[in-house]
């Protein structure tokens, strides 16, 4: 997941701000739900890097390892992964990267306007020469249509939410056929999988953490699964993945 700092650095972060669920300020105080949101787009990266986002315990993700972490730069994370896989003699990593732009009254204030958001992120990603190992995903249909027009070489994945249940309705919002559809796992059924495959679209549901749900999706013959628990996914797919 990509966000942008005040000084236009590309930061790996799910949230556009420091979430009260996990963030600790440089002075050691924890970010609380009642506090004003501290948006990354209003802060230079050297300030962002002083916040800790790893050492607090989590009730949302049981088993989370507690250790000091920062929100890294995307360039550093990608370079580190490329170096690691080469050093270990592993197959090169494939990347499914989300650009977190969205509509809203604070667009252009607390996060960038979508053209700028896309252009800055794609400039970085293309500089890494990842080729067909890169898929860019997004909920924002404005951004997806723009990326398809300006960067036709990209593989794009269309993220849809838990209330998006009609295939024809949400697909009609795009000006093109995406390489991937990424629906909320709860909306995935045999019909949607069949429609995707008939249209030549791969399907990758998000975010399945329950082992029974992971198995249900496997049995539906989805093409990939997004999960917070890769160990559970690997265990469930041991007999399916070569």
Residue ranges and their predicted role:
Residues 154-242:
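C-terminal active-site rim and adjoining tail of enzyme catalytic domains
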């Amino acid at each position: 997941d990509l966000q942008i700092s005040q000084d236009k650095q590309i930061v790996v972060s799910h949230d556009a701000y420091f979430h009260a669920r996990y963030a600790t300020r440089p002075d050691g105080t924890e970010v609380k739900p009642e506090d004003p949101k501290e948006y990354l787009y209003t802060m230079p990266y050297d300030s962002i890097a002083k916040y800790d986002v790893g050492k607090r315990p989590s009730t949302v993700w049981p088993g989370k390892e507690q250790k000091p972490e920062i929100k890294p730069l995307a360039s550093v994370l990608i370079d580190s992964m490329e170096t690691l896989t080469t050093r270990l003699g592993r197959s090169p990593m494939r990347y499914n990267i989300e650009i977190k732009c969205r509509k809203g009254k604070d667009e252009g204030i607390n996060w960038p306007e979508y053209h700028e958001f896309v252009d800055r992120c794609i400039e970085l990603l293309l500089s890494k020469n990842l080729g067909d190992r890169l898929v860019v995903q997004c909920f924002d249909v404005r951004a997806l249509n723009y990326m398809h027009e300006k960067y036709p070489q990209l593989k794009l994945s269309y993220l849809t939410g838990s209330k998006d249940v009609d295939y024809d309705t949400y697909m009609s919002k795009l000006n093109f056929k995406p390489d991937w559809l990424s629906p909320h796992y709860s909306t995935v059924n045999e019909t949607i999988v069949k429609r995707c495959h008939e249209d030549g679209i791969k399907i990758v549901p998000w975010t399945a953490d329950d082992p029974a749900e992971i198995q249900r999706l496997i049995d539906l013959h989805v093409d990939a699964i997004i999960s917070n628990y890769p160990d559970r996914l690997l265990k469930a797919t041991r007999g399916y993945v070569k």
